[in-house]
Amino acid sequence: MVNLPFSRLASSVKRLLIRPLLVLAIVCGVVALGVVLSFPALLAVSIQRDQNQAIATIPEQFPVTVNPRAKTIVENVEVNAFLEGADSPLQATALTAGSMFGYLFTWIATAIADAPWYQSIAAVNGRFVTITSGMRKEQVASAFASTLAWNKNQKQEFVTAKNDALLPLPEGSFSPGTYFVSSRTTPAAAQTLVNDRFTREVLSRYGTTTAAVVPLAQALTVASLIERETGGPDDMRLISGIIWNRLFLNMNLQIDATLQYVKASNTVVGNWWPGVVPADRYRKSVYNTYLHSGLPPTPIASPSVAAIIAALNPKNTPCIYYFHDRAGGFHCTTTYAEHVALLKKYYGRGK
């Protein structure tokens, strides 16, 4: 029997162990790569199924507990239980383990699909366009245009309602979400996709009873303000209650998001939601809620379903003033003096 030196024996054993481990690692890597590369296809199937989904025969209608004409907010126990439950559209916007997985999956899938190398090796014609809640119409048009290489005229065509379109307003009805389009999708076809989703998610659930109490245009406008002002789903209904309180009292809303809308509409500022300075409060515009009482003439952005529901079902709060601190905490008060005191506490100055 040949006696190998210990070092040679150890080396031989090491080689015997490394080879299968290396093969296993390569196989696992190939499988993992295949799974990841399948993300865009899986997302496309899911989105196409939703885009082709027929509207339910009797879709669940949005509840409404505010009455602008009577200037009342009457909270309903059953509605509160629904809105605060796990299946609520408001809770659907909260960051949970499940929602984080969904966001991560969508982000990875769209990032891969947008990569030129993926388009070349996959030989696919599909593209993804993601619209986030709180975007104004120009941002939505730019999102589609950057993916589909539209020119200025095509972008304008997309945001201009056709005679037979269901698009009810120039703002506020570009439903947030991820859309699956082909490289040949026209502005008219893209508008149809957006309109169909808005019909499915909002119009089909906005019953005549609800519309008789709060007209759709009014609800979308309030919801757009909530969407731009909220720090998350937890304060949506509180902000809604404060907005309605100020409307009931015929107070100016004094919402900075409307100043951002005015500022970006009339100046070249580099982004659609620029910071505001005190001088912006004097900008002449019907959208300036510091100068004019009541709601702006149209929504200022496209709200989520959660914000629309919050607009229809505000919290019955005595608060008139509110702000978010630097940590995202929400503070509301019934008097301006209390409001200023809290601002000094958290920001070192009043407002």
Regions found by a protein language model. Name each.
Residues M1-I18:
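N-terminal Lys/Arg-rich, disordered targeting/topogenic segments
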Residues R19-V30:
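Sec-dependent N-terminal signal peptides
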Residues A32-A44, A145-W150, N163-K351:
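Bacterial extracytoplasmic/cell-wall-associated proteins, especially those involved in peptidoglycan
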Residues F39-Y206:
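Signal peptide-directed extracytoplasmic domains
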